[in-house]
Amino acid sequence: MPKVIAINAGSSSLKFQLFNMPSEEVLTKGVVERIGFEDAIFNITVNGEKIKEVTPIPDHAVAVKMLLDKLIELGIIQSFDEIEGIGHRVVHGGEKFSDSVLITDETLKEIEDLSDLAPLHNPANVVGIKAFREVLPNVPAVAVFDTAFHQTMPEQSFLYSLPYEYYEKFGIRKYGFHGTSHKYVTQRAAELLGRPIEQLRLISCHLGNGASIAAVEGGKSIDTSMGFTPLAGVAMGTRSGNIDPALIPYIMQKTGKTAEEVIDILNKKSGMLGLTGFSSDLRDIEEAAAKGDQRAELALEVFAGRIHKYIGSYAARMCGVDAIIFTAGIGENSDIVRAKVLRGLEFMGVYWDPALNKVRGKEAFISYPHSPVKVLVIPTNEEVMIARDVMRLANLA
């Protein structure tokens, strides 16, 4: 059975998951953090046991070498040759990539060229790709893009009402993100509903520290809440979501900050952190709200309220909806947020059971059996989607 590794490289981190394919059995997973520092942390889980090591890891190539050596040392693989495919998460594929792609010198250059669209993420993803090429040069590698699933959006969804030449010259448009997650949970929802995805109108709510909503009709994304960048859409942990663009020069004028500094505030100091003044972590906010902290309660209402509005908007866009899906850290685990989001949607045919809504972190229907619109909790699995694409594109199946 081929072994395939799914990789998510950040600027100073490397997440990994090793699969036996096509059974999709997870052999091990882990993360290398603080790459580039003397006190880098190597975490790996084997047979449910977590192993942690603190050691200097100067760069991603060293992290990759260490990871592979560790797999042999722990007896997970006998030799590097057992790894037959590598899948890399790449945040931005622009308009160039509407599907995952086998990485060649040419496609790698194209991914690098897209870095101005995702300056925080794509360069780190490229570093991860190059590190694996250095250590395992002959193993086929596949890039899986966060944006690819949303490339089916029609122009009316992805165009901004700006001068049209900005789109033609600079590629300014809505791209959307979390595509691999939205694709996984909508495909899984169709399986759980026992209906062909081609017949379904689904609304997928990926709610983590970053959050996005997607309208998926017939298995294709037709609209999503994030935009040209992951800053757009609903309020998030530290991101503002949609605001009036004229606020940017106004804040600059009032505070003396530069445009870059204001964008940094919108990305890192806004959202629920900005509203509460103390945390972007939903668990802290729910705890504070339960103790009567009014700003914490307000942050929850703002967060859930924006999601609630997107659901109404996307239901209108698709002339109805068959199921609403909650996924990612908050979507899978917070019954409080789900309840606030779903409150008042009975007019649309959404009837949910408060007892079933107590579920955390596992697949479940939380709607009543008679509810015309089903509501599901589905833990996302982006890594398995990456592994499946490696099998498909590297012809390992």
Swiss-Prot record:
Mg(2+). Can also accept Mn(2+). Its EC number is 2.7.2.1. PANTHER family: ACETATE KINASE, ACETATE KINASE-RELATED. Substrate binds at residue 89. Gene3D superfamilies: 3.30.420.40. The active site is at 146 (proton donor/acceptor). ATP binds at residues 15, 206-210, 281-283, 329-333. One of its GO terms (molecular function) is acetate kinase activity. Keywords: ATP-binding, Cytoplasm, Kinase, Magnesium, Metal-binding, Nucleotide-binding, Transferase. Mg(2+) binds at residues 8, 382. Belongs to the acetokinase family. This is Acetate kinase. CDD domains: ASKHA_NBD_AcK_PK. One of its GO terms (cellular component) is cytoplasm. It catalyses: acetate + ATP = acetyl phosphate + ADP. InterPro entries: Ac/propionate_kinase, Aliphatic_acid_kin_short-chain, Aliphatic_acid_kinase_CS, ATPase_NBD. The keyword Kinase applies. It holds the Pfam family Acetate_kinase. Pathway: Metabolic intermediate biosynthesis; acetyl-CoA biosynthesis; acetyl-CoA from acetate: step 1/2.
